[in-house]
Structures are given as C-alpha cells and as structure tokens.
Amino acid sequence: MLDMILAGLSEALQLANLLFVLLGVIAGMIAGAIPGVNGPMAIALCIPLSYYMSPVAAIGFLVGLNKGAFFGGSISGVLLNTPGTPESAATTWDGYPLAKQGKGEKALRMALYASVTGDAFATLVLILVAAPLAAVAL
C-alpha cells in the first residue's frame, strides 16, 4: 500500500499538476465567496474545462476547486454575515462580530487555519480508513 501512495504522490507533485491545483483553489475561493455558489456547483460548472487537461491535472483542479470553496465561503461569512457555502455557516457566529470590531483579518486567518487543519485531518483519515472499510464492505 505504501508503494502505491508514493507512486501517486510522485505523479501528483509534478509542477504542472500543482499549478492546476493552485488554480483550482483560487477559483474555488472566488466561487465560495459568492453566496449561493458552493463547491459541487463550482465543480459542475468547471467540468467542461477539465476535458482539456491531463487526467491527474483535472482531478487536482477539481479537488482544489472544492477545497478552495470550503474556505471561500467563510470570506462572505466573516465580512458580510452571509455564509457563501453551507460548510461555512459557523464562521458567521464568531467571525462577523470580530469583523465588526475591526479584527476581520484575524477572523479570516483563523477560518483559513481551521479549514486547512480540518481538511488535512479528514484526508489522512480517509487514506488510512478507505482500504480496510472497502474490504469490509465487499
């Protein structure tokens, strides 16, 4: 299993693929900051763009788009008290009062840290649990 993970990492960490992931994260942050546009909707809108990419770059772009939308929703949640995505509804409770006190940058930074930490933890759990869970399911 470790050899497959390392082979996947070597393919995913190529410069072109990382640039598509970065592009997806930026586009996802913009889409998530627009109230009413969430990650799956942004993915549905950008799937036609993925036809012109390599498969690894396209998957990286779409995953980056979804993960960027998670944080992007907290931008409008903190600054406008209107969450951009359902995942960022909790940022309105603490983030908007901080923004009213003039600490909007701190609230956005904390939302970014929480988004990255939670997403990294969820990804690690998925990597570790997916194979044993699939064996039980089949």
Placement of each model-derived feature along the sequence:
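Membrane-interface alpha-helices at helix entry/exit sites of multi-pass transporters
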Residues: V56-G60, P97-A114
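Membrane-embedded alpha-helical modules
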Residues: A107-L138
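Juxtamembrane transmembrane-helix boundary signature
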Residues: G60, G64-W93
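Short helix-coil transition sites and intra-membrane helix breaks within transmembrane domains
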Residues: A31-M41, V78-S88, F121-V125
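Transmembrane helix-bundle signature of multi-pass membrane transporters/permeases
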Residues: M29, L45-P48, L62-F70, A111-V116
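Helix-loop-helix hairpins and the membrane-proximal interhelical loops
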Residues: M1-A58, A135-A137
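Internal alpha-helical transmembrane segments of multi-pass membrane proteins, especially GPCRs
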Residues: Q14, L23, V63, L108-Y113
